[in-house]
A protein has these predicted regions:
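Nucleotide-activated sugar donor-binding and catalytic core shared by glycosyltransferases
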Residues: 1-162
Length: 162
């Protein structure tokens, strides 16, 4: 089953676009529940997923935190592609790839964000979901999962610089 956690500003559009999709996808709409309930439901959906197709950004860290293999896809308008393409100095934009210093999470960014290649990327991840597990674990370890609270780590880092 397809589950789509939608952001509040686009939830109505997501519901409209997915209304006639095969399999009757479930759209999680944050406007329909309390913030804590939405967050818990979204995390449960992430945890239960065989694979996630996600936009680039912090969602890749949310997926890594629950060990869910992913494919990243994100497009932007032409002028943004041109500007950002000239500014980027890295060969990946996915946080899991950057933090783990790997390239195991497939990315379809800008002009490469097309249905055919994305679908093939999702199928490849479904065939070999374990390929991302080590990178996700390393990412979470480097970000301090299971260690001190983030606020305490940040305070210690600031104090160490003083």
């Amino acid at each position: 089953r397809v589950v789509v956690p939608a952001a509040a500003p686009v939830a109505a559009l997501v519901k409209q676009v997915t209304r006639n999709w095969a399999g009757n996808p479930l759209v999680l709409d944050p406007r329909d529940m309390a913030s804590e309930e939405f967050t818990a439901t979204k995390r449960a959906a992430f945890r239960a997923a065989d694979v996630a197709l996600a936009a680039s950004g912090t969602v890749s860290l949310e997926l890594a935190a629950v060990n869910t293999p992913m494919v990243i896809a994100y497009d932007m308008n032409w002028i943004s592609r041109q500007i950002i393409g000239r500014m980027l100095r890295v060969d990946t934009v996915t946080l899991v790839n950057l933090v783990s210093e790997t390239r195991v999470v497939p990315e379809f960014i800008g002009a490469n964000c097309r249905p055919g290649p994305i679908a093939e990327g999702v199928l490849q991840v479904l065939r070999a979901p374990g390929a991302q597990k080590d990178a996700m674990a390393l990412t979470m370890q480097r970000l301090g999962q299971g260690g001190e609270a983030p606020g305490l780590r940040a305070a210690r880092a600031v104090l160490a610089r003083m």
